[in-house]
Amino acid sequence: MTITPPEQQVKRVRVAFVSNPVETSFEKWSRPGHFSRLLSKGPNTTTWIWNLHADAHDFDNHTTDLEDISRKVFSAHFGQLAIIEIWLSGMFFHGARFSNYEAWLLDPIHVKPSAQIVWPIVGQEILNGDVGGNFQGIQITSGLFQLWRSCGITSEFQLYITALTGLIFSAVLFFAGWFHYHKAAPKLEWFQNVESMLNHHLSGLLGLGCLSWAGHQIHVSLPINKLLDSGVNPAELPLPHDFILDKSLISQLYPSFSKGLAPFFTFHWSEYSDFLTFRGGLNNVTGGLWLTDVAHHHLALAVLFILAGHMYKTNWKIGHDIKGLLESHTGPFTGQGHKGLYEIFTNSWHAQLSLNLAMMGSLSIIVAQHMYSMPPYPYIAIDYGTELSLFTHHYWIGGFCIVGAAAHAAIFMVRDYDPALNFNNLLDRVLLHRDAIISHLNWVCIFLGLHSFGLYIHNDTLSALGRPQDMFSDSAIQLQPVFAQWIQNTHYLAPTLTAFNLVSPTTPVWGGDVVSISGKVAMMPIKLGTADFLVHHIHAFTIHVTVLILLKGVLFSRSSRLIPDKASLGFRFPCDGPGRGGTCQVSAWDHVFLGLFWMYNSISVAIFHFSWKMQSDVWGTVLANKVSHITGGNFSQGSLTINGWLRDFLWAQSSQVIQSYGSPLSAYGLMFLGAHFVWAFTLMFLFSGRGYWQELIESIVWAHNKLKVAPNIQPRALSITQGRAVGVAHYLLGGIATTWSFFLARIISVG
């Protein structure tokens, strides 16, 4: 039996801060590079501006004091949130001032959402298309109108008030950022108190956040949406606070309100089943999730999170201790287990950030999967442009977050990892057998790449030879995704097998009937076949290669056989000095650089798959009980070959963006062209030798010297790392903007 010493049991938690630690002054604003002795001297060469941008937010470079770094990060978070509030306020203001929101509310099926009007300066007013409701503007695909309706916002005046509230909140956040750095700055112990932080974040942010949202949905959103669904004019609705203050009003819609809180305290909770439901599936009026299901979901989450926020030990003797939890995780093959991880996560914010980015990135991709299959807001399911935009948007965010996770994991390894404190724990053991991990992962990538592309090349070859009977397809040699089909069927049967309280399956994707709104498909069963089997293995390949590059960068960031002292060279370095061949582009930063390209590959294939699959097999119109899809179900045959992807998807569907000139969609045509140019321009940075450019610059400088117009600041060619950074940034920018314009011009035209 282990007896805990009494001094370990009592860990007094308090809010520890220092008053007036840093004087408020604008003086530093006028001194670029004030955080570095070298940069603050000003520029001698053009490299100065690059180093300024690279290091301005790298607080580790400014100071080694973890407390000061923590305060800077904490303060910067308030500034970031304030900027987000201003941005959101702008969204609401556009909805109030420049939109057809009220017209859309009256007829969300035929009126398209618009919250942007282009001013006529040199003829750009052509972009203002007729979106219905006697309004001309740019069609938006953000999903904000559908979100606002589900919140219960029924007038543009309410949007003005919300926009103003956002601005006031942003001012409060700016003040908080200044206050907690200059007036009352927390001590390091406050940042490192994980139990208290977990309790407050779980109970406060998530628990009370969900509870307040559930309250809003029950008291405001539900009655307003029920009346809107039944055809009541938004202008004739009672105001939101009327439903809150006048119980008789809401009781007419949901009779259990007349019983008050008695059923709650007597545990007769089923009495509330008129507004807290467990129906599953989609509302057949709006095509969105049942709002009563959504309110129930948030209430359940609130209970879970509020309970979760009471689990961790602070000033009382009960509860979990994170350090204890981690260190008790040992097994027969894991050595010291998680010993040392607590110290890592409380002393390295890069390690903490890495973990959070990996989880948030994965969550964003999960959100993308749910946004189309379980559309959360009314009428969003029949707004195909918005559905496609939200899927793509959440995929990109997920991809960038996951690459960021690898980047900060590598920075942690280089800057914060101490081998002496991590002897024979899980992290040490992973590092010790990194060669086995990477070589196995490499083999998996080769296997997946050869076989997945091999299947396509087989099909391309036999298609060219005119032998369709020998191709892999649903009508010849079938490769059915049997496991995926089994999962679909299991979910479809859930109400009769596992979830007896559920009225219907969670989404029509699993099987069942088509859900259509005014003759337009909202969602329907998605059949999977050989074509999906093939492209899913391309997904597996691209994702595994991305992981291979990123994980290799992390595991070899401190040392490798080639450069045993890599840790001393830092997170990013071009080469290990002159005269050492083969040591260029092996830094952890270079792995992030390469990982970004493969992340781009992974996401492009996934969003292309989604776009084509939905147009082919889901989206369309219902006439005489028959579904007519946008591309007539051509995915199952067209996507079996690489040639088919090029011909039937990229080429066939780019006609709208290429022919958009002279129409309200012409901006997408120009963006498509411009983004291709930006993308192509990056190849000059990515395939280029620095020496060539430096020589060219020297000769241009020589000419300037001859004419006595030489600059004081010497021009320098970009370093290898700078060139790669500029290259990858614009490669991704060009690629994303090309895809964006291609998708939107297409789906707005045909959707």
From Swiss-Prot:
Alphabetized InterPro entries for the sequence: PSI_PsaA, PSI_PsaA/B, PSI_PsaA/B_CS, PSI_PsaA/B_sf
Residues that bind phylloquinone: W693
Spans through the membrane: 73-96, 159-182, 198-222, 294-312, 349-372, 388-414, 436-458, 533-551, 591-612, 665-687, 725-745
Keyword Metal-binding among UniProt keywords: yes
PROSITE patterns: PHOTOSYSTEM_I_PSAAB
GO molecular function list: 4 iron, 4 sulfur cluster binding; chlorophyll binding; electron transfer activity; magnesium ion binding; oxidoreductase activity
Any matching Pfam family: PsaA_PsaB
Annotated Gene3D superfamilies: Photosystem I PsaA/PsaB
Subcellular location: Plastid, Chloroplast thylakoid membrane
Domain of life from the UniProt record: Eukaryota
Main location: plastid
Family designation: Belongs to the PsaA/PsaB family.
Subunit record text: The PsaA/B heterodimer binds the P700 chlorophyll special pair and subsequent electron acceptors. PSI consists of a core antenna complex that captures photons, and an electron transfer chain that converts photonic excitation into a charge separation. The eukaryotic PSI reaction center is composed of at least 11 subunits.
Name of the molecule in the record: Photosystem I P700 chlorophyll a apoprotein A1
Native source organism of the sequence: Euglena gracilis
Organism lineage string: Eukaryota, Discoba, Euglenozoa, Euglenida, Spirocuta
Gene name per UniProt: psaA
